[in-house]
């Protein structure tokens, strides 16, 4: 891995981590196009953990004041994190074994179909909530503890590579009655405890790999910095986008990317 690859992959991570399109799938595709293989590539594995931290710090920076001002919101995030934390801890090894391009491809396509179906369903069943005039990211203050827990359960689906953490939580957020913007904002926030925990657990479990790759720390820091800047821009742009457009475009995009995987990566 070189500086150019670190920058490109940092951009891909920042662009896709919080969009419902599977950052894992795009990282595999990006690495493939750069001529990098995940098989036996310890440097790439460590790099991907590092740049995830850059992305999650963007959420922390964006919502820091909000979290400090609303302790109840922190409590809801903890409740939402509990299912994922427990299942992730118990099934860590099995989850890692699920990682393969074929699983990612099919998860992308299935997730795309689900997004389109849920969007169309909500237009019929709850048109007021799903209208473009409804909701804002301030809606997260009204989310109940029950809704937080249910959305947290949905986050467990993201342990299947290619499903997309944000995709699964946004879909269930919509089904729980949240607006497009409210579902997205809570999904972003729920990433804080989830991704921090996953990142530090990965570092702990693979500490020997990180120590052996200490010579590449400058690449890890560069990629994380790029991911942070790009993710900060994407978070704001995405909330603005979904206040004007539906999630159907993301569903279609997922299906296309899944098909690309089946044709060119497998």
Language-model regions, residue ranges each:
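Multi-pass membrane proteins that catalyze or facilitate reactions on polyprenyl-/lipid-phosphate substrates
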Residues: 1-266
């Amino acid at each position: 891995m070189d500086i150019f690859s670190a920058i490109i992959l940092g951009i891909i991570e920042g662009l896709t981590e919080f969009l419902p399109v599977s950052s894992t799938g795009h990282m595999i595709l990006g690495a493939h196009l750069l001529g990098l293989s995940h098989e036996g590539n310890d440097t790439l594995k460590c790099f991907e953990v590092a740049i995830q931290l850059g992305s999650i710090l963007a959420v922390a920076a964006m919502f820091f004041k909000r979290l400090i001002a609303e302790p109840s919101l922190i409590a809801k995030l903890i409740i939402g994190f509990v299912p994922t934390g427990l299942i992730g801890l118990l099934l860590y090894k099995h989850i890692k074994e699920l990682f393969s391009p074929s699983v990612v491809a099919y998860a992308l396509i299935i997730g795309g179909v689900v997004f389109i179906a849920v969007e169309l369903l909500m237009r019929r069943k709850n048109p007021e909530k799903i209208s473009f005039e409804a909701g804002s990211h301030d809606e997260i203050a009204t989310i109940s503890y029950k809704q937080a827990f249910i959305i947290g359960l949905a986050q467990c689906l993201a342990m299947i590579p290619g499903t997309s953490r944000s995709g699964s939580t946004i879909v269930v957020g919509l089904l729980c009655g949240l607006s497009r913007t409210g579902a997205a904002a809570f999904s972003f926030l729920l990433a804080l405890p989830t991704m921090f925990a996953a990142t530090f657990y990965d570092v702990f479990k693979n500490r020997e790999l990180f120590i052996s790759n200490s010579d590449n720390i400058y690449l890890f820091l560069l990629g994380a910095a790029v991911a942070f800047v790009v993710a900060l821009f994407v978070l704001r742009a995405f909330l603005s986008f979904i206040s004007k457009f539906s999630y159907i475009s993301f569903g279609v995009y997922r299906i296309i990317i899944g098909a690309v995987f089946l044709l060119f990566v497998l």
